[in-house]
Amino acid sequence: MPLDPRKLSSFILILLAIGSYASLQIGHVKIDFFAAIISPLYGEATPDAIILWDLRMPRTLMCLIVGFGLGMAGAGLQGFLRNPLAEPSVVGISSAAALGAVLSIGLGFSAFGLYYTPAFSLGFAAVASWALIKLTSRAVNKHSVILIGVGISSLSGAFTTLMLSLSENPFAINEIVFWMLGSVTDVSYHHVLMSAPLVTLGSFFLLRAANGLDLLTLGEETAASIGANIPKLRRDILIGTALTVGSITSVVGIVGFVGLVTPHIVRPFVKHEPGKTLIWTPPIAALLVLISDITIRLLPTASEIKLGVLTALLGTPFFLYLVSKQRD
């Protein structure tokens, strides 16, 4: 059922505001929220203000960035590949980005500067994206895309496990496990400022592909005959996905299934148009990541469950449902 864009945008903004407030308010320590908000105005560094501004605020912002970027990348991949099962983690891009980060840590490059790990992650995400799009152009059918993605993911996972096995540095092992699980627990404003510009730039490339994705529903040959620039469309999706997924994974690790599930939630409300799905998926995905992170904080566990673990637990049944639906 399609909705009025203004009503939909207003509704989503309200939900995001409520979710952000809940994320700032909810935690293991109860704080006086409004006192913490105004404390910096008086130059006071109260415990509540430190918890709010130094811990929960960057965590909330990172949740929004993670959801926004992964949601847009997932919608872009599904629209371009015309495959509802496509998603950065499913097609191997997230695993490749994590491998880049793991290699940077395991080989000691991360010790030379703060930007080596993101650079490695972005580079590997770009290579995986290029390989996926290149091999997809020769695929016999759309299901071959998933098989190719499984191959990329398996290869990346194998090298990641190899690095974990060969590493003799316990600190490096802990970091590698962090990338494999995905978490926003220890993020800071530095991580937010490092990932936000790249996600924004990647989103620019993906949004440029919105009109082309609509034309692509007519078929590649028909779309090209009426003005769609298929090579440019492929390049925009490639660069956009690599930038968004690579920058996010370089900071928080692998957070899967966000980009898979959210486009399916949005699609019925936008008449199943790929371009509109690409536009409306990011804020909904950001909301889902916020809710997931809030759920993690509410669970009565000795230590917090990693965000990537929870999204995988919630997303895997949905993925299996989609696979069974495709077979039917």
Predicted regions and their residues:
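Alpha-helical transmembrane segments in inner-membrane proteins
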Residues: 1-328
